[in-house]
């Protein structure tokens, strides 16, 4: 889009919101974006450069550690970025707290994206952001250790493979097991669920974190550690180091890791998540979205940047070339990626999985279930006691 067209579009947007026009007249049109990590920072660099070149509006990209915590604190003070990149599961909490602004994309704009991606960002009849991509973990395997045709389809078969590989000093599987995002999919395969899905959203008074399926899944994870199929204390950093150094055959990881493994010269495959007791693991599906700070005085510029620069085939190409985004919310760009098996598998795992509920109560779920997993895998509590406690914490 050239400067004249953008200027006209921005002018129309500002004219539609006189209060914004008045505010923006005294504000330097510098857009600030906060990202989650260095790979997200790199992803935005090219599209931001193009936007500045064509419009004259500068974009400041900041990589913030623990950005979700910093965003909450800054936005609650009326500060922080204009645009923030995060997965949709926290949007309900932030919307409820008045930290993010609802958006009103046109029906024409909405039609460009898969409907479920908008559904994930819609609460209480309002849309709280723009979808970029669909994220789900997959089973990523090192081809120098295990050929594609030999990748087990069940966790039980991974145990058998581990018995063989340990003779060579290699483990069959690892993941950051203390984090619910990676371990709850095992529990969900057996019937655990975060909150009960209803016709209008979620019943936050009905949780399956302590049901029999959750117990079966977590007991299996504990058994993997107890029987030394997974090294006790494995976290995300250890897992990635082991994978790139050839100490483990397969890991649970997401599309954000692909570029890291490519840079490490690992020849890897992306595979469907395995089963447990014949039931497929259910990834916790996130829609990566761009949200606008409720206190931003440059909402009009933010919307123009997002709709006309980021969420286009050109913008998605610029981003995905620098940071693997996984499966795409933009239909036209997903269609262009149909021959990429990694993208297709990610979408398959997303379809097998369950979207993370975007309700304010999710913060209680994350805290409670992480405590249960940590206490169970460390031996501080048995699984039944740990999940009973988690169940009560999620509901109270």
Regions found by a protein language model. Give the residues of each.
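Conserved N-terminal structural module of periplasmic/extracytoplasmic solute-binding proteins
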Residues: 4-9, 18-93, 107, 277, ...
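Conserved C-terminal helix/tail region of periplasmic/extracytoplasmic solute-binding proteins
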Residues: 23-26, 349-396
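Extracytoplasmic/periplasmic substrate-recognition and gating elements
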Residues: 49, 53-54, 127, 147, ...
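Extracytoplasmic "Venus flytrap"/periplasmic binding protein-like
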Residues: 49-115, 122, 128, 143-153, ...
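Hinge/lid segment of periplasmic solute-binding proteins
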Residues: 88-137, 153, 157-160, 167, ...
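Periplasmic solute-binding protein
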Residues: 92-99, 116-153, 177-202, 285-292, ...
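Glycine-centered hinge/linker elements that transmit conformational signals in sensory
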Residues: 162-165, 203-233
């Amino acid at each position: 889009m050239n400067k004249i067209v953008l200027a006209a579009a921005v002018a129309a947007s500002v004219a539609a919101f006189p209060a914004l026009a008045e505010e923006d007249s005294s504000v330097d049109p510098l857009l600030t974006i906060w990202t989650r990590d260095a790979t997200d920072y790199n992803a935005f660099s090219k599209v931001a450069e193009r936007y500045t070149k064509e419009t004259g509006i500068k974009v400041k990209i900041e990589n913030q550690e623990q950005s979700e915590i910093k965003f909450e604190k800054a936005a609650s003070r009326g500060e922080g970025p204009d645009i923030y990149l995060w997965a949709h599961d926290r949007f309900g909490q932030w919307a409820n707290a008045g930290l993010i602004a609802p958006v009103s994309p046109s029906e024409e704009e909405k039609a460009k994206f898969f409907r479920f991606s908008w559904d994930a960002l819609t609460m209480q009849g309002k849309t709280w952001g723009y979808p970029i991509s669909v994220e789900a973990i997959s089973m990523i395997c090192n081809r120098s250790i295990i050929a594609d045709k030999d990748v087990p389809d069940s966790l039980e078969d991974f145990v058998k493979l581990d018995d063989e590989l340990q003779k060579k000093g290699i483990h069959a599987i690892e993941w950051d097991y203390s984090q619910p995002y990676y371990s709850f999919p095992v529990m969900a395969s057996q019937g655990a669920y975060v909150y009960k899905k209803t016709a209008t959203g979620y019943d936050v008074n009905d949780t399956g974190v302590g049901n029999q399926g959750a117990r079966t899944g977590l007991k299996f994870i504990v058994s993997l550690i107890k029987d030394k199929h997974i090294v006790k204390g494995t976290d995300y950093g250890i897992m990635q180091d082991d994978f790139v150094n050839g100490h483990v055959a397969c890991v649970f990881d997401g599309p954000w890791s692909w570029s890291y493994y490519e840079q490490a010269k690992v020849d890897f495959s992306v595979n469907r998540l395995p089963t447990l007791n014949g039931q497929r693991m259910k990834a916790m599906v996130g829609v990566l979205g761009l949200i606008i700070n409720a206190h931003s005085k440059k909402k009009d510029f933010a919307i123009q940047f997002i709709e006309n620069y980021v969420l286009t085939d050109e913008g998605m190409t610029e981003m995905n070339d620098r940071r693997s985004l996984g499966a795409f919310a933009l239909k036209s760009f997903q269609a262009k990626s149909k021959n990429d098996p990694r993208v297709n598998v990610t979408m398959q795992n997303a379809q097998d999985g369950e979207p993370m509920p975007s309700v304010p109560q999710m913060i209680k779920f994350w805290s409670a279930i992480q405590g249960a997993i940590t206490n169970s895998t460390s031996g501080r509590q048995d699984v039944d006691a740990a999940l009973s406690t988690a169940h009560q914490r999620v509901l109270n």
